[in-house]
Amino acid sequence: ALVPRGKAEAFAAAVADAFTRLYPTVSGNAEYTSIITERHAVRLRELLADAQAKGATLMRCGTDAGSGRQMPLTVVTRVNEGMHLMQEEIFGPILPVLEYDSLDDAMALVRRGERPLSLYGLGLSDADQARVLKETHAGGVTFNDWGWHVFQHDLPFGGIGNSGMGTYHGEEGFRELSHAKGVFKRHRWFPVGLFYPPYGNLVQRLAMKFFIGNAPTGPRPPH
């Protein structure tokens, strides 16, 4: 998450409060997800340990520490790009928070990393939203909320660069997963002889017109 300079701690506290209201407890909560395997849970705990060892502040949300593969959300402030959680996809309930000084600064942070699968903008004016769309790259974008572009059946969904290739959902998904077969059938009147040597001035002019768009006049240049 990118927040204005000086707002990281207040943002982390607000996120923790909202999480606690939604999930008062994590352990044994059937409405709260689990990490898919113990190996991935260990990887997430190692990311948090690395960040804390390098100076980050961890704010664990909820009223309990979770158990097994049920891990509560952890908001991480005072992060830097040397931490492992800033160098790879997290795939877990960890939210790093970076501070920015201006919209230009925030967009520079986005451009400096790999192109994300999704980008979310909250509280931006229409003009700033237009700037974000023009000056950053992302697989998809939601303004004033999160994730909703994924659920629109008539919007293409997919990544760009490291976050994936291709688009899916609706017509875009049908086209992506279908093969459009190109077929050419030559008819008898097709002037195929023009494509065989020897070439005259007419063929030269036609070729220049087709490939360059400006057919020269005059005799052919000597070889």
Regions found by a protein language model. Name each.
Residues 1-2, 145:
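Short internal beta-strands
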Residues 70-223:
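Conserved C-terminal structural/oligomerization subdomain of aldehyde/semialdehyde dehydrogenase
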Residues 3-115, 121, 127:
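NAD(P)-dependent aldehyde/semialdehyde dehydrogenase
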